[in-house]
Amino acid sequence: MSEASRVCSGYYSLNHSFVEPFQCPRRGEGATLLYCCGFADLKYCCSEPGSYFPYKHSYMWSLSIGALIGLGIAALVLLAFVISVCVLCYLFLYTKPQRLDTGLKLQHLEAVSTQEGNSNRKSKAPRSNAASNSTNETFYEADDIIQEKTMDTTQINTAYC
C-alpha cells in the first residue's frame, strides 16, 4: 500500500475552517479504514479506495426503495391512462348507432327540385272522383313533357340572343 493513499491532505470545510492533514486510520477508528476518501471539503478514512460517500450502502438502498416506489406509482398511473384511452376509443368506434335504411334513394339536386315542382302541381290539380288513376297519371305525364319542351325552347332562344 502506498503511503500517499493513507494521508488525507488539509482542506477547508463547509464552514470555512481549515482541517489539518491526517493519516488513516485515525485514533479510535477501525484498523480497516486505511484509505483517504471524500471530497475537497469533506475528507475521511474509509476501507475502499475511491469511495466518495461517508454513509453505509444501506442508506443508498433506502433512497433506491423510495425511488422505486415512486416510479412504480407513476407507471401504474400511466398504465391506467393508456387503458382508459383504449377503452374510450373502443366505445367510440364500436358503439355508434347503426345507420337505418330508410328505403329512400339518393337523388341529384336537379331531380329533387323537378320532383318538388311536380308534386306542387299535382296537389293543385283538381281531382275527379269519376276519373281513374291511369287518366290522372297520363294527364301529369303530358304536362311534364310540355314543361320540358318549353324549357328547351327557352334555352335555345337565350343561346341565340
Swiss-Prot record:
Family indicated by similarity: Belongs to the shisa family.
InterPro entries according to UniProt: Shisa, Shisa_N
Lipid bilayer topology: Single-pass membrane protein
Primary site of residence: membrane
Gene: SHISAL2B
Taxonomy of the source species: Eukaryota, Metazoa, Chordata, Craniata, Vertebrata
Keyword field contains rRNA-binding: no
Name of the featured protein: Protein shisa-like-2B
Location in the cell: Membrane
Keywords: Membrane, Transmembrane, Transmembrane helix
Renumbered residue ranges of the record's region Disordered: 115-134
Transmembrane feature ranges: 65-85
